[in-house]
Amino acid sequence: MATNTITTTKVTTTTTDVTGLSLIAAHSHISGLGLDDNLQPKENAQGMVGQLSARKAAGVILKMVEAGKIAGRAVLIAGPPSTGKTAIAMGLSQSLGNQVPFTALAASEVFSLELSKTEALTQAFRKSIGIKIKEETEIIEGEVVEIQIDRTITGGHKQGKLTIKTTDMETIYELGNKMIEGLTKEKVLAGDVISIDKASGKITKLGRSFTRARDYDAMGPETKFVQCPEGELQKRKEVVHTISLHEIDVINSRQQGFLALFSGDTGEIRPEVRDQINTKVAEWKEEGKAEIVPGVLFIDEVHMLDIECFSFINRALEDEFSPIVIMATNRGVSRIRGTDYKSPHGMPMDLLDRSITIHTTSYTADEIRTILSIRATEEEVELSGDALALLTKIGQETSLRYAANLISVSQQIALKKKNNTVDLQDIKRAYMLFLDSDRSVQYLEENADQYIDDYGRVTIGQESTDGSTQPQAKQQEVAQPEATQPQSQPEDDKMETD
């Protein structure tokens, strides 16, 4: 009697999530300044909450930048920590869009071993100035009727003919090697609508003609159908290229300078090169070939700059090619770096006199609750009502940044318990595990003798005879130079005096 055996094979499928480049950052939820058409700030719009007067002032700056006629102005955003100074600058950047150059720079980035301070600031200034270069090109635009390519037996020189048409006319063009390679690379077939730049020979595939929409053919979802062009085949078209002054500097600073744009190894650029470029750009502007677009340079933590950098900014603001400089600081009356003088916001008085100041104020409890709710939505975390209330209280007593950081930590604690909603206990657990700045300072003061001080000394506890731990001042020196004792001279060298 035969026995049938059934074998079951278990197949395990592993799915790997590929993380994209759009990670959640501190200000990724901000998409603008949250203003209406009359520059009136909304209470909660485009990720911005509160700071109504500061956002309205930033809206005025936005209109100045969009007008493109005013440059060389300095704006200072000053306020306590965690009051949204950087958020206002990011909202301004989002509102300007991609057409206006916006360069964000931390003041500590200026200090480098590869570049001098003035060179780093000069490059940042010139990155914030855009040049719109207008160029008229002749293009051939039409629908491909037929492509005929003749190859020799030896496989050498290729020849071909391209039949192209519009709704009004049809023409046959002779093709050379370069054009045949371009058509093959773009995978141009009969029925495609293409555009050919006569000067450079660049071929652009615009789409597929509507007349071929019903053809039996395999097409991908990205296939775009367009109308067959009308009128003449050869047309003149104005093309606008947008480039920054810094990119022009790098390209002209050395042979194959355009490669340095991708590697980032620009190095020091000679002033003579920049002067020649400024002269040429001024000529293009007078001839109507180019248009200067003053952008925005944002310097965060500006109090970290020293007196030489502030002096350079004073001079650079008076230059012809100068952007609008926005600075942010959270310092009060503090010492100017590089000097022994104290000044408001750690900046020299002459630069403060040139700047218009926007002040930010601390957030209220309702505003903190709204911001934390927006952050939770951005991070895809579901908070219970009690958890949001506790986070709001923590944000009031500590800082908004600390409360926002607890959101993702609390989510991991909740997921460990297989809960999709973060509740009150998860927030408490995260609060006990991770200290805020005040509790960290308190712990440090209570246990200061167990940490190494400025002189490399540390007190280590030693167990006494009765079992208790008694602190013993055992000093461990960390690379401390020993004081040199004067050596005793030999008896013969001593001089006796009567």
UniProtKB/Swiss-Prot annotation:
Name the catalysed reactions: ATP + H2O = ADP + phosphate + H(+)
- TM region positions: none
Instruction: Choose one Gene Ontology CC annotation of this protein and give it.
Output: Swr1 complex
Q: Might you give the EC number(s) for this enzyme?
A: 3.6.4.12
Which class of enzymes does this protein belong to? hydrolase
Write down the SMART domains for this protein, in alphabetical order.
AAA (SM00382)
Listed Polar residues bias regions: 461-489
Q: Name the positions where ATP binds.
A: G79, P80, P81, S82, T83, G84, K85, T86
Keywords (alphabetical) are: Activator, ATP-binding, Chromatin regulator, DNA damage, DNA repair, Helicase, Hydrolase, Nucleotide-binding, Nucleus, rRNA processing, Transcription, Transcription regulation
Family classification: Belongs to the RuvB family.
What interactions and quaternary structure are annotated?
May form heterododecamers with RVB1. Component of the SWR1 chromatin remodeling complex, the INO80 chromatin remodeling complex, and of the R2TP complex.
Q: What does this protein do?
A: DNA helicase which participates in several chromatin remodeling complexes, including the SWR1 and the INO80 complexes. The SWR1 complex mediates the ATP-dependent exchange of histone H2A for the H2A variant HZT1 leading to transcriptional regulation of selected genes by chromatin remodeling. The INO80 complex remodels chromatin by shifting nucleosomes and is involved in DNA repair. Also involved in pre-rRNA processing.
This protein's name = RuvB-like helicase 2
Give the organism the record lists. Candida albicans (strain SC5314 / ATCC MYA-2876) (Yeast)
Provide the organism lineage as a comma list.
Eukaryota, Fungi, Dikarya, Ascomycota, Saccharomycotina
Report which gene this protein is encoded by: RVB2
